[in-house]
Amino acid sequence: MQKLTILGATGSIGASTLKVIEQNPDKFSVVALAADSNVEKMQQLCQRWQPEFAVMANKEAALRLKMALAVLAPNTQVLGGQEALCYVATLEQVDSVMAAIVGAAGLVPTMAAVKAGKRILLANKEALVMSGQLFIDEVEKSGAQLLPVDSEHNAIFQCLPQAVQGNLGRCDLASQGVSHILLTGSGGPFRYTDVAELEAVTPEQAIAHPNWSMGPKISVDSATMMNKGLEYIEAKWLFNANRDQLKVIIHPQSVIHSMVQYLDGSVLAQMGEPDMATPIALTLSYPERVKAGVKPLDFTQVGELTFLQPDFERYPCLALAIEACYLGQHATTTLNAANEVAVAAFLARQIKFTDIARVNDSVLNQVCKQSLASGLDSLESLLELDRMARTLADEVVRERAQ
């Protein structure tokens, strides 16, 4: 029986993880559920799963949850704050940690789980975007096992040889016959919208993703293709890929979730319904397979599969992310922070959709001019840079909002 802590239990990844566990009650059990502030949802989950621990990052929310669970789940211990997230991520009885807290907030507890040598089911791409080499080094040092949950990275993982699967972050793709990793993306809801009309896009339009069901932040990132940019950075670290080995392709149908091209001309593609339960099930059970509760792909209903080159005029955030990836750790940490601030401002109707890329570009330029590339060798230094970039992004947002 594999025992789990789920960080980000009230989000869409948390829901899909619990769906897979429900399909396989004899294989997995929930020790701890953790979230930010959604007390109502957490209350329902605790009532259903009766975990040993329930954690709310927001301490006020933790107090409200504690009162609510006194009768509904009296055996569940309720904890609050960032330290509590790290505590349940490192519990001795826990085998695996689903790292699904959105954004920079997920980095510290995910890193704590890595240092504790856990099996890390990595759904929080920002952890690698923000800490890159530091993260990979800690995985190697602690002997933690890293398994990618993101559908694209999970697809790539499945298409790679076992020698690479067991050596993420350190592998040599060329020695295993790999020529290219092809990262696919749908292009979001605006791939055919006139570029001039993007300025007027509303938050409601931006979060209506054509293929996937996701939270608001990642839905906006998919619309700008920043999500693909962050995935590009994550893929660079996970698969130790260089610029020539990593390519982004637009695939509107989201049937193929990514591909690996080999030196002999072969291309392996992983296909399936756009349902996160599939990659989650694989990370939970790897190297075995378990039921995920996902209907099989019906090829007679698939229709055509199309592929396009990304248009960087339409997706300036994707271009920024690829550029940041090769500028260094200071650039990717900065870009991630600026983007989180910009997306929140757009969702709050403070800036336009097209301002997201402008905020990101402005903050990235300001930080790169300050020569902050050195000295980012600790979690504290990265978090300090993250805070600085957010402050700069707030200033740019205020300017653009006027």
Curated annotation (Swiss-Prot):
Swiss-Prot/TrEMBL keywords: Isoprene biosynthesis, Manganese, Metal-binding, NADP, Oxidoreductase
Positions in coiled-coil regions: none
Residues annotated as binding 1-deoxy-D-xylulose 5-phosphate: K125, S151, E152, S186, H209, S222, N227, K228, E231
Binding-site residues for Mn(2+), renumbered to this chain: D150, E152, E231
Pathway this chain belongs to: Isoprenoid biosynthesis; isopentenyl diphosphate biosynthesis via DXP pathway; isopentenyl diphosphate from 1-deoxy-D-xylulose 5-phosphate: step 1/6
Residues the record lists as binding NADPH: T10, G11, S12, I13, N38, N124, E126, G215
Key word Nucleotidyltransferase present: no
Keyword Oxidoreductase tagged: yes
Record InterPro entries: DXP_reductoisomerase, DXP_reductoisomerase_C, DXP_reductoisomerase_N, DXPR_C, DXPR_C_sf, NAD(P)-bd_dom_sf
Enzyme class label: oxidoreductase
Protein EC: 1.1.1.267
Catalytic activity annotation: 2-C-methyl-D-erythritol 4-phosphate + NADP(+) = 1-deoxy-D-xylulose 5-phosphate + NADPH + H(+)
GO biological process: isopentenyl diphosphate biosynthetic process, methylerythritol 4-phosphate pathway involved in terpenoid biosynthetic process
Cofactor(s) in the UniProt record: Mg(2+); Mn(2+)
GO MF annotations in UniProt: 1-deoxy-D-xylulose-5-phosphate reductoisomerase activity; manganese ion binding; NADPH binding
Family: Belongs to the DXR family.
Function comment: Catalyzes the NADPH-dependent rearrangement and reduction of 1-deoxy-D-xylulose-5-phosphate (DXP) to 2-C-methyl-D-erythritol 4-phosphate (MEP).
PANTHER family from the UniProt entry: 1-DEOXY-D-XYLULOSE 5-PHOSPHATE REDUCTOISOMERASE, 1-DEOXY-D-XYLULOSE 5-PHOSPHATE REDUCTOISOMERASE, CHLOROPLASTIC
Protein name: 1-deoxy-D-xylulose 5-phosphate reductoisomerase
